[in-house]
């Protein structure tokens, strides 16, 4: 199995508090290949409709239980070869962020954890407007 975690830099997360770290750690423990990508690394391959690719880095746990990767090992993959993509980055809700959700929307095969369409349509700062009784 192969999981991709689209997230903020994994080497900068707090391993005692971050739920994404816990997902990755458990996935690695179970023998699942885990990869990291930055949203800006996702692209559509020219002249190939629906070929959405990304540059990725393989994630490992070092001896201190921190996530590590080697930037020189950046490789390109077809995102439909992943079993699941976890969209976990903190949103700067800007055009790059929106464009990334549209590209990920085009994928047919992998399980998308945090649906890009719903992320785009219901930004966390606005979702509370749907529940005024809770504010």
List each model region and its residues.
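Extreme N-terminal starter segment of soluble prokaryotic enzymes
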Residues: 1-4
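Conserved N-proximal alpha/beta basic substrate-recognition cap immediately N-terminal to
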Residues: 11-135
